[in-house]
Design a protein with these regions (language model features):
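Histidine- and acidic-residue-rich, metal-dependent catalytic cores
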Residues: 1-183
Length: 183
């Protein structure tokens, strides 16, 4: 789960950046943050997803992973502060209800990363729940994000009917979506 989640989140970020009007450099930074946001828990993330209910120790690991991931990246030579801040803050929520620091204000790149992370988590199945449909995930995310531009960008770029979805046409025929449409 951990590696595929990071890859899928990075792909959503790659689509979202230009939709937000970000240049290639800023979008690349967002993608790098998505690929590395969970580096501190990659080895256990799949087990956590398979277990369903977490122990208090496992919850502590989850709460600490943003700062631990950023520290591991620093030790590995990453010095891009936007990248590091996005990783550190990708579970923060404006107003202080996020973790690990309970920040009142959250970096814009971190917010974009969080939206992509949440969206991909919603459409991924877990032991304790089925995956949400793209439509339901988009609706929930947009409502929870209170119209944040990153949520809108994901919905517009990912689409309500992404490639691979089976849809019923007005004629009653079934079809498979083969590409994203212009939105």
């Amino acid at each position: 789960y951990g590696l595929t989640h990071a890859l899928h989140t990075a792909l959503v970020c790659m689509l979202m950046g230009p939709r937000l009007g970000w240049d290639a450099s800023r979008t690349r930074t967002l993608v790098k943050a998505a690929l590395t946001m969970n580096v501190a828990i990659t080895d256990v993330q799949g087990r956590f997803a398979a277990v369903g209910h977490l122990t208090e120790r496992q919850r502590d690991q989850i709460r600490a992973h943003p700062q631990e991931a950023a520290q591991a990246l620093r030790v590995g030579g990453v010095d891009d502060e936007v990248w590091l801040r996005a990783v550190e803050q990708h579970h923060e929520r404006a107003g202080g209800s996020g973790y690990p620091m309970g920040l009142q204000e959250v970096d814009e790149t971190a917010m974009a990363l969080r939206m992509a992370d949440v969206f991909m988590a919603k459409i991924s199945p877990r032991v304790e729940r089925a995956a949400l449909s793209v439509q339901d995930a988009a609706r929930q995310m947009y409502a929870e994000a209170q119209g944040h531009p990153s949520a809108a960008a994901i919905i517009k770029e990912y689409g309500i009917y992404p490639p691979g979805n089976v849809v019923k046409l007005a004629s009653g025929e079934l079809a498979v979506v083969i590409r994203r449409g212009a939105t």
